[in-house]
Design a protein with these regions (language model features):
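Short, surface-exposed beta-strand/strand-loop-strand elements in extracellular ectodomains
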Residues: 336-348
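Extended extracellular/luminal ectodomain segments enriched in beta-structured repeat modules
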Residues: 318-328, 381-384
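C-terminal, surface-exposed recognition/capping segments
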Residues: 209-212, 236-265, 330, 386, ...
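Short beta-strands within extracellular/lumenal beta-sheet-rich domains
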Residues: 297-319, 337-340, 368-375, 404
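Extracellular glycan-recognition surfaces and repeat-rich motifs
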Residues: 264-300
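Short beta-strand-plus-loop segments that form exposed binding edges in beta-rich domains
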Residues: 387-398
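Extracellular carbohydrate recognition and processing domains
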Residues: 349-381
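Short aromatic-cysteine micro-motif
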Residues: 67-75, 105-264, 412-438, 537
Length: 537
């Protein structure tokens, strides 16, 4: 399974580092993987990395448990074992919003499997799927100035040596499909930066059916499902700056600059221990144009029906020691478009950002509104807590207001903290061992084409048929296409003669339309799209 110069790894949560795993998977102190459907190690899909040449020999010869710093890693991969699946239909017993699990069975190399595990005339035991969207050490993406800057037209493209697949870097875009394809194929060229040996591996751009296989496994008891009827949606990467591995605070979160959580960042829910801490009285600054109304301590925003406006309510306070700020907030508004959010800044630096809440699910009358409590533990310093109710350019819903009450600031308060997944919610397993950026981030080109139509992909002729899936109809059952259309409300538009190339996953700002089951079409031209790479061996 491991090719030459690939290193098995696991994540040490205590120290927030990746370490070399025991390749035999017998050492429980340095475990590598588990594809069990339950138990302590559920969701621990096998991860492996390549490293730069500087310390490659050291890490290859190192003992299990050796730290492998992210600075030395240039690519990260996740193993997708060979499996067969019952083709899903009718939301698999669930609903559009909550489809059921896909029935997946792991099989041996000589047993029947879905077609993603057939590569040319070879039956695969599995394949390595890139853990994150494709990035680059030096190339950036700026529309109009860096289009097709990979410059890859053959399998010996020098720019491919700068490919990186890791978290917290900006995805590479603005390249057409052929550029991404030849960059992926060039990762195994002689003298490559990753240590790949071309006689052992085939590096290529993800085909549509390979994406589909990952989507199937995600929507199974080995991925995001805890039973045949209970599954959770992969959270969106909502970073509008295209940072890899980021996550929103809900599956369909609206975009923020860098996302809410990094890939390994936990969410901490705190509860104040009653009777601890001393009260700090914050200074309240109301909006001068659309002031909030104070009704017995309940503040409501003042820009109802005022389109393209924002009404703010600001609390300023100073903590002389570690402390907390807590509050209750709610909203009754047009779903997705009119939202209440909050932001906490320390000395003008944002330390807590949110995507906001919207809709009418919390209530349609003020007396019956359901509120959500938030508690944030803060270090010593001066802070501003700003609530913002923002209106889009048209349409109202519910009461068309945001609500805030019970704002409390305490110096020296004690809290009971509960650690929950944060960034991990954006992976295919809900753990750090899954695959990221498959919902949001950037749309991703895959090698799936309608009727072998080259269009604006950049190919002079298509590569060997083992590198792409060809479709000749307006629908297809399999590959997570027609059979999973609109699951979780993910967008779905099939390829055609005008836009013959598939892309998957969705953008940072697609909200509910983004997801592992999203499909859409394009001419294959350079655009704000990235790609995903695969290793078979």
């Amino acid at each position: 399974v491991l090719a030459s110069n690939m290193i098995p790894v696991y994540y040490d949560e205590t120290n927030d580092v990746w370490k070399k795993a025991d390749v035999s998977n017998l050492d429980k102190n340095n475990p590598w993987y588990s594809y069990n459907s339950s138990g302590e190690y559920k969701g621990m899909w096998a991860n492996a990395v390549t490293v730069t040449s500087t310390n490659r020999t050291t890490y290859l010869n190192a003992s299990p448990g050796t730290v492998i710093p992210m600075d030395d890693i240039n690519t990260m991969w996740v193993w997708i074992p060979r499996f067969n699946a019952v083709t899903p239909s009718n939301y698999n017993g669930g609903t559009k919003e909550a489809p059921g699990a896909i029935d997946v069975t792991f099989v041996k190399q000589n047993e029947t499997a879905i077609d993603a595990f057939t590569f040319g005339n070879k039956e695969l035991s599995g394949f390595w799927y890139a853990k994150f969207e494709t990035s680059h050490t030096t190339l950036t993406a700026t529309a109009g100035t860096t289009d097709n800057n990979l410059g890859c037209t053959t399998t010996t493209c020098s720019n491919a040596n700068g490919i990186i697949i890791k978290p917290n870097v900006q995805s590479l875009s603005r390249n057409n499909i052929s550029n991404f394809f030849y960059a992926s194929r060039s990762m195994e060229q002689s003298g490559n930066s990753f240590g790949f040996v071309s006689s052992e591996v085939d590096t290529h751009m993800s085909k549509n059916n390979e994406w589909g296989a990952v989507a199937y496994l995600t929507q199974s008891i080995y991925g995001r499902c805890i039973s045949s009827t209970t599954c959770s949606e992969v959270y969106i990467n909502n970073s509008l700056r295209y940072y890899t591995g980021r996550s929103g605070d809900i599956p369909s979160a609206l975009s923020t600059s860098t996302g809410i959580y990094e890939y390994n960042q936990n969410k901490v829910e705190s509860t104040i221990v009653e009777g601890t801490g001393t009260t700090v009285t914050p200074t309240i600054t109301n909006d001068t144009t659309y002031p909030w109304t104070n009704n017995s301590g309940v503040y409501s925003s003042g820009n109802s029906a005022q389109y393209e406006t924002t009404s703010t309510l600001t609390y300023t306070f100073t903590l002389i020691d570690k402390g907390v700020v807590s509050f209750d907030y709610s909203v009754s508004s047009e779903e997705r478009y009119d939202r209440l959010k909050y932001r906490i800044s320390k000395d003008s630096t944002i330390v807590v950002d949110t995507t906001g809440i919207s809709g009418t699910s919390r209530g349609m009358t003020e007396s019956l509104l359901e509120y959500e409590n938030k508690v944030h533990v803060l270090e010593k310093g001066t802070y501003t807590l700003v609530f913002l109710y923002s209106k889009d350019d048209g349409g109202d819903g519910g009461l068309d207001k945001g609500y805030v009450k019970n704002v409390k600031v305490l110096n020296g308060a004690q809290t009971i903290d509960k650690v929950l997944p944060g960034g991990q919610n954006a992976s295919t397993t809900g753990t750090i061992y899954g695959i990221y950026d498959m919902a949001g981030g950037l749309d991703e080109y895959v090698m799936g084409v309608y009727n072998k139509t080259i269009s604006y992909s950049g190919f002079s002729s298509l590569p060997d048929t083992k590198y792409y899936n060809n479709y000749t109809e307006s629908s297809y059952t399999g590959h997570a296409l027609t059979e999973t259309k609109n699951w979780y409300s993910d967008g779905a538009v099939f390829v055609n003669s005008s836009n013959p190339w598939f892309y998957r996953g969705g953008m940072f700002n697609n909200s509910m339309a983004a997801g592992v089951f999203k499909i859409y079409n394009s001419s294959g031209i350079y655009a704000d799209m990235s790609s995903r790479f695969v290793i078979t061996n």
